[in-house]
Amino acid sequence: MNKNSINYLVGKNAKLNKILSPFSQIIVFFLDDLSKTLKIINKKKHSDIEALSFFCRKNNIEKLKNNHFDSKVIRFGLGNLFHITPSNMPTNFAYSLIFGLLGGNSNIIKVPSNDFQEMKIICKSIIL
C-alpha cells in the first residue's frame, strides 16, 4: 500500500504514542472527556453514539477496571495495534479503539469506506 493513499481521519503517520499501563488515568480522563463531547456534538441523537457516550463515562471505565484488572500485577501495552473493523457497523471502530487504548496501546484502525455520519461525529469528537 502506498503511504500517499492513506487518509488519516485522526492523528498522523509519524505520531504513535508510547505504550501505557492498562487503564492509564490519562486514557480514562480522555474517554470521560470524549463521552461529554459526544453528548454535545450528537445533535441528531444517533442512538449508537449515545450508547458509546454512555460506555465511555469514567464510572463505567472504572467498573471495567475493577472487574477485569488486577492492579497487583505490573502490565504494559504491547505497542501498536492494527484493527480492521466491519464495514456495516459505523461505531464498531470506536469500541475497538477504546479497548486498544485501555490496554495501553497505540492504535491504527482501518475504518469502513462507507461515509457514515456517526463515524464523522466520533472522529470530530476525538479531535476536539
Give the predicted meaning of each segment.
Residues M1-L78:
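N-terminal Rossmann-like NAD(P)+-binding subdomain of aldehyde/semialdehyde dehydrogenases
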Residues N67-I127:
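Conserved small-residue-rich beta-alpha loop and adjacent elements
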